[in-house]
Design a protein with these regions (language model features):
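Pepsin/retropepsin-fold aspartyl endopeptidases
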Residues: 1-135
Length: 135
């Protein structure tokens, strides 16, 4: 199990559970700061992050209908290899959204981050722990 400290958001001054996550697609890799969001249904990948990984928007065909603040935003489902710290890489499914990272951050939600990892939040201590699922 790996322990993380909340990161203070510059705009709001509020602690947020952020992790550095390495994403891989083929030979291309990218490390993103992702919000571990137990209230999010899906993992979200901003447009520019997908483009950096070599994804081509026009080649996608698995349409995702989004709700909430992303309702009406065009999105496609993509599967990427992801690695958190020293843990073994796993496959995560993302809704790749047509919004840049300046408008939406990478989110790790119920499908399927919380199916691959056990997450424990200790909000009063501004700490959270993550461990790969037991096999």
């Amino acid at each position: 199990m790996t322990k993380f400290f909340y990161t203070i958001d510059r705009q709001s001054g509020v602690g947020m559970p952020l992790v550095d996550l390495k994403l891989l697609k083929g030979v291309k890799g990218l490390t993103v700061s992702a919000l571990v969001d137990s209230g999010a249904s899906l993992n979200i990948l901003p447009l520019d992050a997908g483009l950096e990984l070599g994804l081509v928007w026009e080649d996608q065909n698995y349409v995702i209908d989004l709700g909430g603040v992303l309702k009406g935003t065009q999105a496609y489902g993509v599967v990427l290899e992801a690695q958190l710290g020293d843990s073994a890489p796993t496959h995560l499914a993302f809704a790749w959204v047509n919004r840049p990272s300046s408008q939406i951050r990478t989110l790790l939600g119920q499908v399927n981050f919380f199916q691959e990892y056990d997450v424990y939040f200790y909000g009063s201590e501004q700490v959270f722990e993550i461990k790969p699922k037991s096999t």
